[in-house]
């Protein structure tokens, strides 16, 4: 999709950009594949804030996405490419020849009326899902499983892709979008191609209100809070931090402090750390 610019009719629209939705072919989702989505406002079941900067926004319906891609050996036709408000990537509605309908992530290059398939017999073609053991080395992939049958967990955002670098026994070696290289069981599935809608990161929101439409609340600086709310808070006027270095709202060192658990069980699968 291309980027649409707006005329500077107001200050908010002066540098605003949006996607032109040229690839979108349907305005309403498949009713049988949607669910009610209630707002949580970033709170957990105790009512406590666990994710900051969430709340409000336009009402949404959740689209049920097939991340498992386990409908083996049955061809499906791409019926529509649709917008999904719950993720950065677009989604594609697949009509299988046995009558079932499913949503999948829309990879780059996928068009209406193209065919997709899952399973070991599927061709190496954009949108097809196979075990890593059946995918040639060097192929770009997305929607990668970490446990066989659990469904894709890695590389699902717009414009992202991973590359299959090699195979070593029962493991496949994959370079992820972050630059990290890790081993994944070769029986895990992945989908061929890169995730579409790669211009998503180029969109300029333009004004605060548009962020609120998306359910994003403001990010407030710690230095303008009270001491009860943030380690940087309090003091008279624009006071310095008063500590040896900047801290998170929970008192942990900020800016470069490593938060990954030491001796994590999955460390042995990481061949090379991500680039900083």
From Swiss-Prot:
A Pfam family this chain is assigned to: Ribosomal_L2_C
InterPro entries in UniProt: NA-bd_OB-fold, Rib_uL2_dom2, Ribosomal_uL2, Ribosomal_uL2_bac/org-type, Ribosomal_uL2_C, Ribosomal_uL2_CS, Ribosomal_uL2_dom3, Ribosomal_uL2_RNA-bd_dom
UniProt keyword RNA-binding, yes or no: yes
Protein family membership: Belongs to the universal ribosomal protein uL2 family.
Quaternary structure annotation from Swiss-Prot or TrEMBL: Part of the 50S ribosomal subunit. Forms a bridge to the 30S subunit in the 70S ribosome.
Functional description taken from the UniProt entry: One of the primary rRNA binding proteins. Required for association of the 30S and 50S subunits to form the 70S ribosome, for tRNA binding and peptide bond formation. It has been suggested to have peptidyltransferase activity; this is somewhat controversial. Makes several contacts with the 16S rRNA in the 70S ribosome.
Name the record gives this protein: Large ribosomal subunit protein uL2
């Amino acid at each position: 999709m291309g980027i649409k610019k707006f005329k500077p009719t107001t200050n908010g629209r002066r540098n605003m950009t949006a996607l032109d939705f040229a690839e979108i072919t349907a305005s309403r989702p498949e009713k049988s594949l949607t669910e009610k989505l209630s707002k949580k406002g970033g709170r957990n079941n105790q009512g406590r804030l666990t994710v900051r900067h969430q709340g409000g926004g336009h009402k949404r319906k959740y689209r049920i996405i097939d991340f498992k891609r386990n409908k083996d050996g049955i061809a499906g036709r791409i019926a529509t490419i649709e917008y999904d408000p719950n993720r950065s990537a677009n989604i594609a509605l697949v009509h299988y020849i046995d009558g079932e309908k499913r949503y999948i992530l829309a990879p780059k290059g996928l068009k209406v009326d193209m065919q997709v398939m899952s399973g070991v017999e599927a061709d190496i073609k954009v949108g097809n899902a196979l075990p890593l053991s059946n995918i040639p080395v060097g192929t770009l992939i997305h929607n990668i499983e970490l446990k066989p049958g659990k469904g894709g967990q890695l590389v699902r955002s717009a414009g992202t892709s991973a590359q299959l670098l090699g195979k070593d026994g029962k493991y496949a070696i994959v370079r992820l979008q972050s630059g990290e290289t890790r081993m994944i069981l070769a029986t895990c599935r992945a989908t061929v191609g890169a995730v579409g809608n790669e211009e998503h990161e180029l969109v300029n929101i333009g004004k605060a209100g548009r962020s609120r439409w998306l359910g994003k609340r403001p990010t407030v600086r710690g230095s303008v809070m009270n001491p009860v709310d943030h380690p940087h808070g309090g003091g008279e006027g624009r006071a310095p931090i008063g500590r040896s270095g900047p801290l998170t709202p929970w008192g942990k060192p900020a800016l470069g402090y490593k938060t990954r658990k030491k001796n994590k069980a999955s460390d042995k699968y990481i061949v090379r750390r991500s680039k900083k």
